[in-house]
Regions:
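N-terminal helix-turn-helix DNA-binding module of bacterial transcription factors
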Residues: 1-82
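An alpha-beta-alpha
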Residues: 185-228, 327-341
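Alpha-helical recognition/docking segments in bacterial nutrient-uptake
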Residues: 1-3, 24, 85-187
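Hydrophobic alpha-helical segments within soluble ligand-binding/sensing domains
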Residues: 172-199, 209, 235-243, 261, ...
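Short beta-strand segments enriched in small/hydrophobic residues
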Residues: 35, 40-44, 79-94, 188, ...
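Short beta-strand elements in bilobed, periplasmic/extracellular small-molecule ligand-binding domains
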Residues: 109-121, 198-199, 216-236
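Flexible loop/turn connectors
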Residues: 5-6, 22, 247-254, 259-342
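Periplasmic-binding protein-like
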Residues: 88, 134, 138-146, 198-201, ...
């Protein structure tokens, strides 16, 4: 039988977290190496996912690391890696659709073994600073959600745009085709009796122009009046657009996005009008707002999971150098019908 130490432990086995006083410093690879009786190099390879480490050894090291409360320094690992599997994602998290793209891109990239560094632009953080941040963490390619998230400084970085029109020929583009979903929306409104339909426009840019063009084309195809009203991409914009007044006789609204539609509905309710009865309302993006019981908004779904997966696939191909030819991918949109259209 093996000798026992005075404390009841077997000789030659390093104490683990439950046997020793809690460490007061950040747990390091050296701590794990001493506790497991292995070299620092082996520990580093195991925790870094190297295939050179046998499964039983990896499991032992991971168990020791967990017992010691080890937390990897992710930033240091990313900076030290010879060829890190990292993508950047630049978006505006004030927009519901961008939030959805972010979630889908993170999930899909993780399945492919890549990390995604996310930066959001807003009034206090411009697009160049956002790009600089993801590139400092060695993103090998960047996905931009909307052309407003494209940097004009970092033009040598492989770039994939989720949007309507690429500002440069070397940028990969994944777009949601507006025509099918918008055509379905106008067809539904016409079946429900609408004859004068107003489009609450979005902020200036390729996305707003593409949605407006699809709206006008669909109205023309169905022989109904297509009117436009200044709107925007947030709740206040939709609310103020309705308060400012819509053209006489308008019996249905198609809004640039769901947030704009949300504001329009609040204004209609404030005026004593019932959405789905007194005014039919359609949004775009099929966000969580649209699907909520509180709003139940008919909306055009942009297939964000499919769009994000295509963008991630192309970004990975560019990051690995597998494909240096800019691609153009398109995904159809589809109408999701709810109570706001009767």
């Amino acid at each position: 039988m093996s000798k026992q130490s005075s404390s009841g432990r077997r000789a030659g086995v390093a104490p683990l977290a439950h046997d020793r006083p809690a460490l007061t410093h950040r747990v390091t690879l050296d701590d794990i190496a001493r506790a497991s009786g292995l070299s620092i190099a082996t520990v580093s390879r195991a925790l870094g996912g190297s295939p050179r480490v046998a499964a039983p050894t990896r499991e032992k090291i991971e168990k020791v690391a967990e017992q010691l409360g080890y937390r990897a320094n992710v930033a240091a690992s990313l900076l030290a890696s010879a060829r890190p599997q990292i993508l950047g994602l630049v978006c505006s998290l004030q927009q519901e659709l961008h939030v959805r793209y972010r979630a889908e891109a993170l999930r899909y990239a993780e399945d492919r073994g890549f990390r995604v560094i996310v930066e959001s632009i807003d009034a206090s953080r411009d697009v160049d600073r956002a790009w600089e941040s993801v590139l400092q963490l060695r993103a090998q390619a960047v996905i931009a959600v909307d052309s407003t998230c494209i940097s004009t400084r970092f033009t040598n970085t492989p770039t994939v745009l989720i949007g309507q029109r690429a500002p440069r020929r070397d940028i990969d583009l994944v777009t949601s085709a507006n025509e099918l979903g918008m055509g379905q929306a106008i067809a539904l409104l016409v079946r429900r009796g609408s004859r004068r339909i107003a489009f609450l426009e979005g902020p200036p840019g390729p996305s707003a122009r593409a949605r407006k063009a699809a709206f006008t084309q669909a109205c023309r195809a169905h022989g109904v009046d297509a009117l436009t009203v200044a709107g925007g991409d947030n709740v206040d914009a939709g609310f103020l657009a309705i308060r400012a007044g819509v053209p006489a006789g308008v019996d249905a609204l198609v809004c640039y996005n769901d947030q704009c539609a949300h504001g329009a509905i609040l204004a209609l309710l404030g005026d004593g009008l019932i959405p789905g009865r007194d005014m039919l309302v359609v949004g775009c993006d099929n966000s969580a707002i649209a699907s909520s019981r509180a709003l139940s908004l008919t909306s055009i779904d942009r297939a964000p999971a499919r769009v994000a997966s295509l963008a991630v696939d192309q970004a990975i191909a560019r990051a690995l150098g597998d494909d240096d030819r800019p691609s153009r991918r398109s995904v159809d949109t589809e109408l999701v019908v709810r109570a706001s259209t009767g």
